[in-house]
Amino acid sequence: MSRIGKQPIAVPSGVTVNTQSGVFKVKGPKGELTVPFNPDLTIREDNGQLLVERPSDRQEHRALHGLTRTLVANAVKGVSDGFVINLELRGVGYRAKLNGKALELTIGYSHPVVIDPPAGVTFAVPEPTKIDVSGIDKQLVGQVAANVREVRKPDAYHGKGVRFVGQQIALKAGKAGATGGKGKK
């Protein structure tokens, strides 16, 4: 058995699930998601929990077992609680603001960078240097957060740019001349 795949998924109250040939649908207070899965696997509800089962121990089924269980668990968590990824801006004059639903970043370019959120994702700016990306689809929220970070990745020498909150950036030392002549002669 897959260590991940055999774990049951708790279904919170207010969340309804429906499984039809290869499609898992879940509806909750935050919205509705559809997760396609391999029709060889079965998803059944048992005492308020979901169980993902595989028909055999073939390599293909073992590989899909844990993946499907995780995708279903993410969908259930998304429609009940949602997902939030926090980003922060580091750098002199770097700031963010909301322009309607769009995110406007001033991050060292000659023009502000405007990012429109796709359907199902919202931006929040609690402080000028903090950005919250939220939504019900974990994959989409993560991809949008990565796209925002990609606009200005943290540089290797000063760490200026857009980073995930708590992300450690390994800074390079810089030129030996900048350290007071302690390099090779």
UniProtKB/Swiss-Prot annotation:
One of its GO terms (cellular component) is cytosolic large ribosomal subunit. Keywords: Ribonucleoprotein, Ribosomal protein, RNA-binding, rRNA-binding. GO terms for molecular function: rRNA binding; structural constituent of ribosome. Pfam families: Ribosomal_L6. The keyword Ribonucleoprotein applies. One of its GO terms (biological process) is cytoplasmic translation. NCBIfam families: L6_bact. Belongs to the universal ribosomal protein uL6 family. Part of the 50S ribosomal subunit. This protein binds to the 23S rRNA, and is important in its secondary structure. It is located near the subunit interface in the base of the L7/L12 stalk, and near the tRNA binding site of the peptidyltransferase center. This is Large ribosomal subunit protein uL6.
